[in-house]
Amino acid sequence: MPTISQLVRKPREVSVIKSKSPALENCPQRRGVCTRVYTTTPKKPNSALRKVAKVRLTNGYEVISYIGGEGHNLQEHSVVLVRGGRVKDLPGVRYHIVRGSLDLQGVKDRKQARSKYGAKRPKKA
């Protein structure tokens, strides 16, 4: 326990909370343009071809973001909405692209967890 004179000399330091998605600049989402759409492989115990896109955001940042779901229609120059959220087995991927918004279509024939993949409610037979 420090004395009062020690606290006068050197006050307590307030810990700064670092953002996990700094490129969004405290916004819930940001719009951006795809500069490159490609696949990459995950870290050690896992094996796959994960779909990712390099996106230039409206604030000038260039980020790598993940395209969730099965199949997508993204190309270079597609306009997308980027949200926070990292992908644990892809180093450097700290953002997700929102499905069913702007140029990216929702997942086709998705029945469960539809809101996360921008899929409309299926028509009843």
Swiss-Prot record:
Signal peptide: none annotated. The keyword Ribonucleoprotein applies. It comes from the Bacteria. PANTHER family: 30S RIBOSOMAL PROTEIN S12 FAMILY MEMBER. InterPro entries: NA-bd_OB-fold, Ribosomal_uS12, Ribosomal_uS12_bac. It comes from Bordetella petrii (strain ATCC BAA-461 / DSM 12804 / CCUG 43448). Belongs to the universal ribosomal protein uS12 family. One of its GO terms (molecular function) is rRNA binding. Pfam families: Ribosom_S12_S23. GO terms for biological process: translation. This is Small ribosomal subunit protein uS12. Keywords: Methylation, Ribonucleoprotein, Ribosomal protein, RNA-binding, rRNA-binding, tRNA-binding.
